[in-house]
């Protein structure tokens, strides 16, 4: 597959939904993680991302406008020892619980399926970074319906060996749509990762659709020292 420019990918899609990027910095020094949230409804847009321990959680920007917390309030990122979990829903907790019990990322997600938000049946996307011996490996997954059919759940898993300057990008929606928003199709997209954490963060945030973007989390993990750098950007301030 052709390696894509993440800036162009985002700028050319008004509504990819929620997205995960995992890869390795161009200088080979850092594991790179990004997670973004977009929204169309008042309930979806009424959110901010805040730090929680080594990870993050979402919370309502204006609690009075929170109509349904079930699919919008969750912990997208949690850390367990040398493993960082990133997902677009409460399956973060499922993966954390399974890994803590010595079970696998795949086994955890096989207990879950797409979100129950008919007619979209939004995919659940998940990633895992595992640090080891000055390097790392990573995985991505998507749990989706077959063309919006809730009786036909599908699950896909992808395993990667990191390459300098390369990441993989998966998002919930192929593009905007009505009455049903079409789910992401195919493999995670190979994308270039350029610059330091601030350059990377700016590249993502400035190219997400201005009306629909809600929050962005980025993290660079130094593979030699384990030092973590994190950036969080919220539209609501």
Question: Language-model features: where?
Answer:
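Conserved short alpha-helical segments that host acidic/polar catalytic motifs at enzyme active sites
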Residues: 1-237
């Amino acid at each position: 597959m052709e390696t894509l420019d993440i800036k162009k990918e985002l700028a050319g899609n008004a509504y990819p939904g929620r997205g995960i990027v995992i890869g390795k910095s161009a200088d080979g020094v850092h594991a790179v993680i990004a997670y973004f949230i977009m929204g169309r409804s008042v309930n979806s847009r009424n959110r901010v991302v805040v730090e929680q321990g080594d990870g993050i959680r979402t919370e309502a920007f204006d609690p009075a406008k929170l109509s349904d917390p079930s699919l919008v309030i969750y912990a997208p990122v949690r850390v367990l020892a040398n493993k960082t979990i990133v997902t677009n829903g409460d399956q973060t907790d499922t993966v954390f619980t399974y890994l803590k019990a010595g079970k696998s990322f795949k086994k955890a997600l096989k207990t879950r399926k797409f979100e129950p938000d008919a007619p979209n049946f939004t995919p659940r996307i998940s990633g895992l970074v595992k640090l080891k011996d000055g390097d790392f490996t990573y995985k991505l997954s998507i749990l989706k319906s077959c063309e919006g059919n809730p009786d036909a759940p599908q699950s896909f898993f992808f395993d990667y060996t990191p390459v300098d300057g390369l990441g993989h990008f998966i998002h919930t929606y192929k593009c905007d749509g009505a009455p049903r928003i079409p789910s992401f199709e195919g493999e995670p997209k190979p994308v270039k990762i350029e610059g330091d954490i601030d350059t990377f963060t700016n590249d993502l945030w400035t190219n997400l659709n201005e009306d629909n973007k809600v929050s962005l989390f980025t993290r660079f993990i130094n593979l030699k020292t384990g030092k973590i750098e994190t950036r969080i950007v919220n539209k609501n301030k």
